[in-house]
């Protein structure tokens, strides 16, 4: 039976630096079998809806995610079996018809705004991190990312932030902070916190290799 991989959950508000923190951990272990799985990949398929309906979907609500499939995939990876992870198309606001093959690893970083919201997912994690970043910084980062990478207009980003992103953060995301083992203020720029986390991960990996 394969050894259980280390599962690290990384969450926080949109634009808060979750991905940067995750990449900082990934880059610290270049010689290890380590990979990141994004909750965003598991947004539900909306191909049955019109484009206008897809645009108006609340993507910051737990119902927007197929977390059941994500949990199923992580359990498969824990068991040592590869999975085919969906690829989400942000320009069309639905899943594409493509997937990518994820092989079993020694460490998985599970990243997303709501990865600590579901107890079943939390229970699979060995380390749970919450990236805590000021609201003003998050909205600036979100505007830059969505305009450059996702083809969004400034007006649509601001409207979505005020009507959906901000209220959903306070209703669903911020409350999951209580489940975190470590809260990281200011994200990846908090080098002390990142170093401590990397030291902990290295320690767990070393113990796992001895077992």
Curated annotation (Swiss-Prot):
EC code: 2.7.1.48
CDD domains assigned to the protein according to its UniProt record, in alphabetical order: UMPK
GO cellular component: cytoplasm
GO biological process per UniProt: CTP salvage; UMP salvage
Enzyme class: transferase
Subcellular location: Cytoplasm
Domain of life, source organism: Bacteria
Pathway in which the depicted protein is active: Pyrimidine metabolism; CTP biosynthesis via salvage pathway; CTP from cytidine: step 1/3; Pyrimidine metabolism; UMP biosynthesis via salvage pathway; UMP from uridine: step 1/1
Keyword Cytoplasm belongs to the record: yes
Any Pfam family: PRK
List of residues binding ATP: 12-19
Keyword field: ATP-binding, Cytoplasm, Kinase, Nucleotide-binding, Transferase
Primary localisation category: cytoplasm
GO molecular function: ATP binding; cytidine kinase activity; uridine kinase activity
Entry keyword Kinase: yes
Catalytic reaction list: uridine + ATP = UMP + ADP + H(+); cytidine + ATP = CMP + ADP + H(+)
Annotated NCBIfam families: PRK05480.1, udk
UniProt similarity note: Belongs to the uridine kinase family.
PANTHER family associated with the record: URIDINE KINASE
Stated name of the protein: Uridine kinase
Provenance organism: Streptococcus thermophilus (strain ATCC BAA-250 / LMG 18311)
């Amino acid at each position: 039976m394969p050894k259980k991989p280390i599962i690290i959950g990384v969450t926080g508000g949109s634009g808060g630096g979750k991905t940067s923190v995750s990449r900082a951990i990934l880059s610290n272990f270049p010689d290890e079998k380590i990979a990141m799985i994004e909750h965003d990949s598991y947004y539900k398929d909306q191909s049955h809806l019109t484009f206008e309906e897809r645009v108006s979907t609340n993507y910051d609500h737990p119902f927007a995610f197929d977390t059941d499939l994500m949990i199923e995939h992580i359990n498969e990876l824990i068991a040592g079996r590869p999975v085919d992870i969906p690829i989400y198309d942000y320009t069309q606001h639905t899943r594409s018809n493509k997937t990518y093959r994820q092989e079993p690893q020694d460490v998985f970083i599970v990243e997303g705004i709501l990865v600590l919201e579901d107890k079943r997912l939390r229970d699979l994690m060995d380390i749970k991190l919450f990236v805590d970043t000021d609201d003003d910084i998050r909205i600036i980062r979100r505007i830059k990312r969505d305009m450059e990478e996702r083809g969004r207009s400034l007006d649509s980003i601001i409207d979505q932030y005020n009507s959906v992103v901000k209220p959903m953060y306070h209703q669903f995301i911020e409350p999951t902070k209580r489940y975190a083992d470590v809260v990281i203020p200011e994200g990846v720029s908090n080098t002390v916190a990142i170093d401590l986390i990397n030291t902990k991960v290295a320690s767990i990996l070393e113990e796992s290799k001895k077992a």
